[in-house]
């Protein structure tokens, strides 16, 4: 039987602002990426997110981003590898400490937004992030875009690497995600998106925007839980994966 992890970005509310539908999405996933206070979240939300995932028996991952609350961490910033390492270590240490205080530990780390995309193409940036993770916990799993520099850097650092794919995003021939401003960036047809996931998991290929099939490794599928439609999609993708002999389980069970 095939295995895959379903992950979602959570804990992105802060102060009086509520973002996402965490309570409804948590039971549907196997790994949670919790924001660490830079692009979103705050200490209270972080603790609440840990409590919710613990109660549901879901594995916790840190979701560090750039220090850009106004831009939700989606705007590129000119940062050095040294800054990337410090930003990462600062955020995962905060969330990791809260996890420890609640009898939990971080399973994985997945950078957020612009930091994720920048690192996917920049080996030096990826290496700095992975060095921070290795310094924090050499057993932690690094989640990054399948085939990216982040995956290469993780392996070079001796870390466990989990290749992530996206159900609702288009791919370029080089394996990178199509820019959101370009045509073909988003897969809006649910059945098409799910069929692509099944193919990525079982066949290890995905069709790029050019129409060419490219190789891809699918250890984890990112799903979004903001909005009722997205919630229904997650329920549907779980059902179809199970019907196609794909077992949904946390990264720790897949990467080992």
Where would I find each of the regions flagged by the language model?
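Conserved, mostly hydrophobic/aromatic
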Residues: 9, 63, 109, 223
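Active-site-adjacent beta->alpha loops and helix N-cap segments on the catalytic face
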Residues: 15-21, 40-52, 120-127, 146-155
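Glycine-rich tight-turn/loop motif centered on a GG-T
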Residues: 18, 22, 32-39, 70-85, ...
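Acidic (Asp/Glu)-rich catalytic clusters
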Residues: 23-27, 48-61, 100-102
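Glycine/small-residue-rich loop that forms an oxyanion/phosphate-binding "nest" at active or ligand-binding sites
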Residues: 68-108
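Flexible, glycine/charged-enriched surface loops at secondary-structure junctions
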Residues: 99-107, 204-215, 245-254
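C-terminal domain-boundary segment and adjacent tail
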Residues: 140, 232-256
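Active-site rim beta-loop-alpha module in soluble metabolic enzymes
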Residues: 147-206
